[in-house]
Amino acid sequence: KYDFIVVGSGLFGIYASLDLNKKGYKVLLIDKEKFPYKKASIVNQARVHRGYHYPRSVTTALASNDFSERFIKEHSDFINNKFSHFYGIDRFGSLTNANEFVRFADFLGLDYEETRINAPFSNQRLEALFKVQEYSFDPFLFREFYLHILNKTKVETKYSTFIKSAEKGVNTWKLKLINFDKDEIFVECTNLINSTYASINEINR
């Protein structure tokens, strides 16, 4: 029986597993991929979100911005801030116009500078273009760094494994896992954390 089972071995899943292990909990980390850190953490999360792209959700943007400085400080060796980052507001198809973006950024205290450049942007198509402070990071260095730490802990891992069924009891979760060899594995945990991204609704159902 585990204190926590964490589903999804991307940045959030590994980070949560390490933090829980540090606090003395028995943790199992599972992922349907053969290797950890292969999906959204590389494809979608390879930049430090500060909230600029959430103008329709102030709560989400605020949370992103609040934690960005801590994230940058803890991972400074992997951060790339040597480039210019722009957000363009489409004149015809955007659900947010330039004035709304400015009000949103001002409300959150996000830095921006309205600007105008040529290629690769179509200035005829854009209502406004903003230069902002938002950095990227190297996801492969992240993976190497965190897996090195993970392998030194007591966190148990099961890759090529997915949840076939989950049953919530009074104080525990009972899970049936299946790996790529079609082996069935039955495990129990007190707490279940879903840190997937692309398959989050598939698991929640």
Each PLM stretch: what is its role?
Residues 25-27, 112, 192:
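Hydrophobic anchor at the start of a short beta-strand
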Residues 45-120, 125-128:
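Dinucleotide-binding Rossmann-like beta1-alpha1 core, especially the glycine-rich loop
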Residues 15-19, 48, 73, 77-82, ...:
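Active-site substrate-recognition segment that forms the wall
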Residues 21, 106, 151:
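Anion (oxyanion) recognition and catalysis
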Residues 12, 35, 199:
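Conserved Rossmann-like nucleotide-cofactor binding loop
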Residues 21-42:
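Glycine-rich FAD pyrophosphate-binding loop
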Residues 130-191, 195-202:
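Helical element adjacent to the flavin cofactor pocket in flavoenzyme catalytic cores
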Residues 2-28:
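N-terminal Rossmann-like FAD-binding beta1-loop-alpha1 element of flavoenzymes
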